[in-house]
Amino acid sequence: MTRDQNGTWEMESNENFEGYMKALDIDFATRKIAVRLTQTKVIDQDGDNFKTKTTSTFRNYDVDFTVGVEFDEYTKSLDNRHVKALVTWEGDVLVCVQKGEKENRGWKQWIEGDKLYLELTCGDQVCRQVFKKK
């Protein structure tokens, strides 16, 4: 594994995204649209500083963060909540804890070969996404 996550990544698979969105109380119509979308993720990484853009034909989401520095995140394009987020390294895995209304919320992201793996968690639901480097 590597800590270098720079690049453009295209979604290959998206397992249990609907379950994850239900745990976030996202409405039925939005879930039905979102679950059918393919996302592209662009990561601009400079050491521990990240600028991430996630795009689809429905909604886009940008988040900038520095590893080890807590920040206020507004999850506008997902569930419209404000959370306190902290991203840290666990080995070569980025781990984000998002504190707010929902318990056990966050994500893990890592690289293996030419694939980026992302696990999104809320409550007891885990969504597993795989992206391939473009």
UniProtKB/Swiss-Prot annotation:
Mind listing the UniProt keywords for this protein, alphabetically?
Cytoplasm, Retinol-binding, Transport, Vitamin A
* GO terms for biological process, alphabetical: epidermis development; fatty acid transport; vitamin A metabolic process
Q: Summarize tissue expression.
A: Higher expression in adult small intestine and to a much lesser extent in fetal kidney.
The family database entries (InterPro entries) matched by this protein are listed as: Calycin, Fatty_acid-bd, ILBP, Lipocln_cytosolic_FA-bd_dom
Q: Where in the cell is it found?
A: Cytoplasm
GO-annotated cellular components = cytosol; nucleus
Record family assignment:
Belongs to the calycin superfamily. Fatty-acid binding protein (FABP) family.
**Name of the protein in question:** Retinol-binding protein 2
Q: What gene name does this entry carry?
A: RBP2
